[in-house]
Amino acid sequence: MKIAIMNCLNHNTRCAGAACLNAMNRRIRSFECYKDTELELVAMGRCNGCEAGMDAGMREKLERLVQEGAEVVHFGICTKNKEGAECPLISRSAEYLEQHGVKVVRGTH
């Protein structure tokens, strides 16, 4: 199964992506449903930041995920604020992906 992981650009200053990759590789937390499934990570990316919003570059990233055949995109826990509300850009990105036949999972580790 081809999957991708998307994270928050603002959190990138302190995140190496190790916890997301660890959860995927060990098939724990949001990746537990794949415990008997071979996974291919086709992309690991970030949004373009709050200020950029759904700009041409972000749309290009999402289109690329579809072109690469991503069947599922996991949005990292960093795409929600402390209260648990999802970033509006991530919500729009998820909607775009779902409209193009890509399953969206909110969560990684």
Annotate each language-model stretch with its function.
Residues 1-62, 86:
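Conserved mixed alpha/beta catalytic, RNA-binding, or beta-rich assembly cores of soluble enzyme
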Residues 54-87:
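Mid-chain, well-packed structural core segment of small domains
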Residues 31, 44, 82-109:
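Short acidic, glycine/proline-enriched helix-loop-strand junctions
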Residues 8-9, 46-47, 77-78, 107-109:
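Fold-independent oxyanion-binding glycine-rich loops
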Residues 39, 68, 100-102:
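A structural motif corresponding to the C-terminal end of an alpha-helix
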Residues 25-29, 64-68, 95-98:
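Short, surface-exposed linear patches
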